[in-house]
């Protein structure tokens, strides 16, 4: 894959152990704001699992109990002091409150792309280390370089390029496509990049319906009727959270996703809760390789076991991705401590993030795009099948970054429209 200036966290962690041991007792805590939807319809599938995932990792970091390759207590010796804030309540104002009144060292958060678009310039203005853990809009880094803002998972362009490739691999004779996406940046960009990718790969595919209900509308009777009449081979949807659940439930009585194959790019959050309503054959994404599509590893086994023990259920992919952001702090902080032989400041951590790679329960993350501020990981999709009453994913395909990630220096839409020059797909 395309990786320039990559710095291995395993090397840094070995050097950091002694420095961490020396600084752990005396270092001030690292105050971290952790923001997601902890109330409302998004809280169940996204916000609460995200918080739970962070809890598991923070507890292990503070106790020095993370699996290899990590070692030592804290972030370069600084224990994490979490402050949880609900994204549902005036996200921009609450961000300012975290920074200016509560004095956090860093902020991890934001599920909604709308939140991230609003907060990114404020983070730069206030010069506060901010890690976006879930929002996917490409605007964050394509509309100007950032110094203080990072994203520790893929952006939506990568998800939808991979979705297009997967869809055509399972439906090579695809003729017609419809879209059901929320009417704001995330939904508009997701549909744009998916359909442009599909049509670049198979130019004869026709769009027969495009539906853009407002975010968190909740009721989709008119849109479901329109999609049923269109009778497309495939319906693409980037709905997430409570909107995704509502769509699945309202589509079920009409058999919409049985007649037309659903391509649900965030469908992994509904696997367990709505398994009986999701038709076999539905294409399921997890926005990377978290949750049900996490690769086998000792780290993943540890995370799943710890999560199940504490919360009594399987971790879904939002739990993985907030955990991933916390691990980015740990990896960068330990690297900075190894270099300075002292507890890292937030600015030390910020400077250690570009070019870093680090291990997570969802696999390796490379801080490689947009001058090291945008993460790169592999992407995975699978096909839903209910087996013995249990949800399973079959025909799983994994896409390496060289196949689905735009090259450095290129904008995603331009790369798609040019026909993915330089892509290396197996």
Residue ranges and their predicted role:
Residues 8-19:
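Bacterial N-terminal signal peptides
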Residues 19-26:
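Sec/Tat signal peptide C-region and signal peptidase I cleavage site
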Residues 30, 357-426:
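Solvent-exposed, acidic/polar segments of extracytosolic/periplasmic ligand-binding ectodomains
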Residues 33-57, 85-89, 111, 180-189, ...:
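Extracytoplasmic "Venus flytrap"
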Residues 45-72, 192-200:
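Short, polar/charged alpha-helical segment
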Residues 45-49, 64-143, 152, 213-220, ...:
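Beta-alpha junction/loop-to-helix N-cap segments that form part of ligand/metal-binding clefts
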Residues 52, 104-210, 259-284:
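Extracytoplasmic ligand/sensor domains, especially the bilobed periplasmic-binding protein
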Residues 251-324, 334-340, 393-425:
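Extracellular/periplasmic periplasmic-binding protein-like sensory domains
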